[in-house]
Amino acid sequence: MMRIGNNSQGIWQLFSRMNGNNAFGRSSGAGGRNTLEDQLTGHRKNSYGVEGMCVTNNPNARKIIKVSDEMKQRVFNSVKDAYYKYNGMSGDNEAEWEEMAQAKNNYYKTLKKEDRVAAAWTLGQLEISTGRKVANAVKEKVPGWTHGKPIPSDVLDEIFADESITSMVSGKSGTVEGLDIQV
């Protein structure tokens, strides 16, 4: 018969052997995972290791801020690819999704911690707004079109050359004035 105290000592020893002298793995090599120390100190990270992404009780969670032109262009290109490759659908290419997620999270790491969740919200709203605008333009040119149905490439070429679409990644885009947001 083993006592509970002895059992927990054995578990403690196992964790200690796995993680050196830090039984709960204080290693910086924990990737994007939150260590016990992170949790206790409030340094919570998303799955990519980015702090400041928690939306719970965060006043910045639905705030539009200025974001880099490079990231706006990446979001625009992602929407464009979704229309050319997948007829306005998101597609199923995990490598593309992962590459975009990595790019966004690397960008967030360059920002102040308190701006990161707002930047994520802003880029998400830019993606939604651009997608809506393109979908409405497609529906004007191809009556009866719905997401997933084929779109002639010449129609998409015309839409993505239109200044009302391209201006979404320049000028005031990424600011409150530049986004057509419906919350």
Model-derived regions: residue spans:
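Type III/flagellar secretion export determinants
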Residues: 1-183
